[in-house]
Amino acid sequence: MCEMKKNYFYSILLPLVIIPTGGLLILGTCYLFYLFIYNFVEFWFFPTNPTAVPADMIRRVYALALLIFYLALLRTKISDIIQSTVLVGPIGIFFTTTILAFYEKPVMAIAVTVVIVAVGIFLLYKYKKPWIYYYALVTTLLISIVLAWPEA
């Protein structure tokens, strides 16, 4: 009986807490690093005209770089719970970038986000990833919508 409770704790309860908590910390770190990059570009390349900073381009390149980093991380032997927790950062930035790219066209933002989620679910299924990756994907989607969706 004790072994069953221990297994339940490590396989279900722990991921339910670690993924959103650790994921939020990683997502926050990703946002702070984006802010650092943005401020660096503004300070060194656009000191007299801060509104000329190509924020969209910086955000898109950064999101792509994070996705490439995450794909490299997937090839390591790091545990699934750490990989799924780290997934929140790159995917969160990617969702936010997508939503902001279609900020004035909410229907298009929804359509592209649904396509990204569908591709993500397909890839997770194809590579037989455990449920914690799906949980991380859905958690990230909800967080990104709250953070990036246009206010009414």
Model-derived segments and spans:
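Terminal transmembrane helical module of multi-pass membrane proteins
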Residues: 121-152
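Juxtamembrane "helix-exit" motif on the non-cytosolic side of transmembrane helices
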Residues: 30-45, 95-104, 146-152
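Membrane-interfacial loop-to-transmembrane alpha-helix junctions, especially the N-terminal start
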Residues: 77-89, 131-135
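Alpha-helical transmembrane segments
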Residues: 11-27, 89-92, 140
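Short alpha-helical packing/oligomerization segments
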Residues: 83-118
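Hydrophobic transmembrane helix segments
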Residues: 20-67, 86
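Canonical alpha-helical transmembrane segments
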Residues: 61-81, 117-123
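Short, Lys/Arg-rich, polar N-terminal cytosolic tail immediately upstream
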Residues: 1-9
